[in-house]
From Swiss-Prot:
Keywords: Hydrolase, Magnesium, Multifunctional enzyme, Nucleotidyltransferase, Repeat, Transferase. Uridylyltransferase (UTase) activity is inhibited by glutamine, while glutamine activates uridylyl-removing (UR) activity. This is Bifunctional uridylyltransferase/uridylyl-removing enzyme. Residues 737-818, 848-931 form the ACT domain. Modifies, by uridylylation and deuridylylation, the PII regulatory proteins (GlnB and homologs), in response to the nitrogen status of the cell that GlnD senses through the glutamine level. Under low glutamine levels, catalyzes the conversion of the PII proteins and UTP to PII-UMP and PPi, while under higher glutamine levels, GlnD hydrolyzes PII-UMP to PII and UMP (deuridylylation). Thus, controls uridylylation state and activity of the PII proteins, and plays an important role in the regulation of nitrogen assimilation and metabolism. The gene is glnD. It comes from Brucella abortus (strain 2308). It catalyses: [protein-PII]-L-tyrosine + UTP = [protein-PII]-uridylyl-L-tyrosine + diphosphate; [protein-PII]-uridylyl-L-tyrosine + H2O = [protein-PII]-L-tyrosine + UMP + H(+).
């Protein structure tokens, strides 16, 4: 990279700035250390800093060079520090006859020493002394540091002599690493050179294994802290897996081992090929561009590429939308592919280190846990060997001789439970061009792959290695298209390929009985479908494979499944099942969370879709794996309960156990059952109570809950309380039930949901019933927050008290809602296109209104209030949140209990709900279809 490319003269003109300071000093009447003079010098340097940064940002926007920008900002800082240090030592605190003790070198260390900076990067300085600090030296250091701090810079500093540097580097790996990056800035260069020589001779020599072991352990700890996967959708660009620090670690290791100063020297040594060096430089340049843009855009040292800044960074980098993917998703896919490249480089360099240095460096093998050099053959043709519990290639040409070996490598690793030798993975990565149409259609390769995918051991681990090496995306090109693909929303925590691998991991855990407490039904069902277990693994690999395309990914994915399954060796009937599962993989989740499971038509319609018990079992397990693998905190007991309820109710239909009794007959049976449970009540009181609820109550509420409600209402009547609440935690379902008894009025549910929101209750479901004497019995389910039932009950009782206070007029709801926190900062980056659908076919008794929009505090209260204002009665509400998006379903009738069939009235309802949903939308659209949340 030449000075011409850098255009450093456009960043800062060192001679002009130096001359300006000298002229100011020459014409000054005051002492150079006086406050007025200090202010003038400081302002001059601050102006140069601001101008240089602005120029660097302009140049970044024009040429897009991340490494160029980092070097320009570093040059700017070098220049300012050099001129400031010169002013400090020649003007502020000059020495007439300096002794040797008053020599000093100013050294850049750490990230600054590497020669690249973002705008908010720390400036790490070492004031290097020959001996002990002198009074003159203290004055110079203090003057320099305070000027830098007053310029608004984050400066880390140390003042040490050479002996101290060597001693501390021996004791502290962080200091050793910082000195490894040391770069001379200004002052006594011979002093710095002495430090370099002693560091090489006294610290580096003979400590290579120790250093590498420490750096790799440090990297692993950093990954655990930042997030193990490189596919977290809000990555830390500096510290995350596949980020800048991983590249730094690679260069530290090679620099320490090979005594190189530049990456280019690694090609001469055979560590990297020319193509791999190009990959290293491209990754470094991209990460610098992203990080520099982040610092410029946020005006701070922002290292996390969060949702709220992803759109701006994508725009700054020039990304545009393509069919099926918006500009943010295209940018983030590029980011994750670069992170994957960093992982490839890690494997390549580790392989080179082990191969070229292990024999020559005592103790080196301990780094890679190779306690011996024993080898054994793993295949009849001798192509693969087991070397210290890791699979390796026996010859460099085995992949070229037989490309099926590229799949066989993973098959043998799975069968023998082996890790992968870095040399094998390096050779594999360099042989990816061998994966062509012939290999993809090879029956043996596909047989081996299907056995890997459906392995009874740990298929996710092997598939992950296949993906990291690039083999999986090459062998299944449709999978390659979703590698590193993110979805710009707050619901999905991982890229699409990472999600698919995690789905397979969840299925394997269920199959091994590791999740039987959390998922009892899936744990049982998996034992009954042994013949079809392979189909589940294939489906999970393929169910989201069509994400990022313009059309519905479920339909497009089903077509891909129909094409791929025969290639994998599945029979026509197995292919048909997988195709159906992929097409319907969202259906069970949608029905369970967005429909009234107490409505018989919901169950009958779902049973018509499923048709057989075998498909119902497969779809249930598939749905559990899909939801659980979305990310931490997405799965909860309430979703599990909804899915189990839908499963059991549908099972009754499919096995012929579903009762076809009339509503009147079932109502009569339910009332008789409750009367029997209330047999200890006086007959007159019992009969009066049984006349209170309407038919829908008896057909939808369980008998145990009916009994509990009866005692609840009886106690309220005896106490003369018209308004009362009751709380009941449901630990396994991870929800808490709040029952409200109150005089009925049109906006009651709106007030209750608003009070719930004001009290911090997150509503997931609501059932609304009225009694013949004009009261409402509303049951609200809120997400659980505490581990113990006692704590959760107390919290729910506080929510209930707020509901009572609002309904009784003791508290003013608008004021309470105004105090609630605003939408999360990240949510403001999104726009969810408002959607309202009014459907009369989903229920025999109710009109179903489904709304979709950007979630915000108090939205449910606004929606229910508007629905009430439109003269509609809400029988039940079902609330589903997908990150920033909410999908709410309301089962409603008009005020006389009829469906809403008039088209004009439907149009009016839709317009007003759309207006409400669009009132406070976000800034950008993610362009998702209604089902894309799953």
């Amino acid at each position: 990279m030449s000075a011409h490319d850098l255009k450093l003269e456009e960043i800062v003109n060192a001679e002009t700035l130096r001359r300006k300071l000298n002229e100011l000093a020459d014409t000054a009447d005051e002492s150079y250390t006086s406050l007025p003079m200090r202010k003038v010098v400081l302002q001059t340097l601050k102006d140069a800093l601001a101008s240089g940064r602005a120029n660097a940002e302009d140049m970044l926007m024009k040429d897009g060079g991340g490494t160029l920008c980092a070097k320009r900002l570093c040059y700017l800082m070098d220049t300012l520090i050099d001129i400031l240090f010169e002013f400090a030592t020649t003007r502020a605190y000059p020495t007439r006859n300096p002794s040797k003790a008053e020599n000093m070198a100013l050294v850049a260390v750490g990230g600054y020493g590497r020669g690249g900076l973002a705008q908010g990067s720390d400036i790490d300085l070492l004031f290097l002394l020959p001996y002990k600090q002198t009074p003159w030296g203290e004055q110079v250091v203090e003057y320099t540091l305070y000027m830098l701090w007053d310029m608004g810079l984050k400066v880390g500093h140390s003042t040490r002599n050479i002996d101290e540097c060597i001693r501390l580097a021996r004791e502290d790996m962080t200091i050793r690493t910082a000195l490894l990056d040391a770069r001379f800035l200004t002052g006594d260069k011979d002093l710095f050179r002495t430090l370099e020589i002693r560091f090489e001779e006294e610290i580096v020599k003979g400590t290579e294994p120790e250093f590498i072991q420490a750096k790799l352990a440090e990297r692993d700890a950093r990954h655990r802290k930042a997030g193990e996967t490189r596919y977290l959708v809000e990555p830390n660009v500096k510290e995350g897996k596949g980020g800048q620090r991983d590249l730094h670690t690679l260069f530290w290791i090679t620099k320490y081992f090979y005594r190189v100063k530049t990456k280019e020297e690694l090609v001469k040594l055979g560590v990297l090929s020319r193509a791999e060096l190009k990959l290293f430089n491209k990754a470094e340049d991209f990460l610098w561009a992203v990080r520099c843009h982040m610092h410029f855009a946020t005006l701070k040292a922002e290292e996390r590429l969060s949702f709220d800044i992803q759109p701006e960074i994508a725009q700054r980098l020039g990304y545009t939308a393509h069919p099926g993917q918006n500009y943010v998703e295209r940018f983030m896919k590029h980011y994750f592919l670069v992170a994957k490249d960093v992982g490839d480089l890690t494997r390549i360099i580790c392989a080179a280190l082990e191969e070229q240095q292990a024999k020559h460096v005592p103790g080196f093998n301990r780094i890679f846990l190779t306690f011996s050099r024993r080898k054994r053959k793993l295949s009849d043709d001798g192509a693969f060997i087991s070397e210290n519990h890791r699979i390796n290639i026996a010859r460099p040409d085995i992949f070229r001789q037989d490309p099926v070996n590229m799949i066989r490598l993973f098959h043998l690793a799975d069968r023998h439970g082996l890790e992968f030798h870095p040399e094998a993975m390096q050779s594999l990565t360099r042989s990816l061009k061998l994966i062509n149409a012939d290999l993809r259609e090879n029956p043996e390769a596909n047989r081996l792959f299907l056995e890997i995918l459906t392995s009874p051991r740990n298929p996710e681990l092997i598939l992950r290695r296949m993906n990291e090496s690039g083999v999986l995306g090459k062998f299944i090109p449709d999978f390659g298209k979703i590698v590193a693909m993110m979805q710009f929303n707050m619901y999905h925590h991982y890229t699409v390929d990472e999600h698919l691998l995690r789905c397979i991991a969840v299925l394997s855990e269920i199959e091994h009985g590791e999740l039987k407490t959390e998922h009892p039904l899936s744990n049982h069902l998996i034992t009954t479908i042994k013949r079809d277990r392979n189909l589940l693994y294939v489906t999970l690999l393929l169910h989201d494979i069509a994400k990022g395309r313009p059309e519905d990914h479920s339909i497009a994915g089903a077509r891909i499944a129909r094409r791929l399954c025969p290639r994998f060796g599945l029979t026509p009937s197995e292919t048909e099942t997988v195709e159906w599962l992929v097409r319907e993989h969202l259906t069970m989740s949608m029905v369970a969370q967005s429909r009234d499971l107490n409505d018989r038509k919901t169950i009958i319609d779902f049973a018509d879709t499923v048709q057989t018990m075998e498909r119902l079992k497969l779809l249930l397990i598939l749905t559990v794996c899909d939801i659980k693998a979305v990310g931490p905190g997405i799965w909860n007991g309430w979703k599990g309960q909804l899915l189990r309820t839908l499963f059991y109710e549908t099972e009754l239909v499919l096995t012929g156990g579903f009762s076809e009794l009339s509503r009147a007959a079932r109502d009569k049976q339910a009332r008789e059952a409750l009367a029997e449970r209330l047999s200890d009540w006086p007959k007159e009181e019992r009969d009066a109570y049984l006349a209170l609820p309407y038919t829908n109550y008896f057909l939808t509420v369980s008998l145990d809950d009916q009994v509990r409600h009866a005692h609840f209402i009886r106690d309220a009547d005896q106490q003369g309380r018209a308004l009362v609440t009751m709380a009941k935690p449901h630990a396994f379902e991870a929800v808490t039930e709040i029952t409200v008894l109150a005089p009925d009025h049109p906006r009651l549910l709106s007030v209750i949901t608003g009070a719930c929101a004001a009290a911090g209750g997150n509503i997931v479901d609501a059932q609304i019933f009225t009694t013949s004497d004009g009261r409402a019995l509303d049951t609200i389910l809120i997400s659980r927050e505490f581990d113990t039932d006692d704590d959760e009950r107390r919290r729910a009782e506080r929510v209930g008290k707020v509901i009572e206070d609002v309904l009784s007029g003791k508290a003013h709801l608008p004021d309470m809602l105004a105090k609630r926190t605003k939408p999360k900062k990240a949510a403001r980056a999104f726009k969810v296109e408002p959607r309202v659908e009014i459907n009369n076919t989903l229920s025999n008794k109710f009109t179903v209104i489904e709304v979709e929009g950007l979630d915000r505090p108090g939205l449910l209260s606004e929606l229910t209030g508007l629905i009430s204002d439109l003269s509609l009665d809400i029988a039940s509400a079902h609330i589903t949140t997908f990150g920033e998006k909410v999908i709410d379903s309301f089962y409603v009738t008009d005020l006389v209990g009829h469906k809403i069939s008039n088209a004009t009235r439907q149009g009016n309802i839709k317009r007003k709900l759309l207006a409400l949903l669009g009132a406070e939308n976000g800034a950008r659209t993610n362009g998702r279809s209604p089902q894309a949340a799953a």
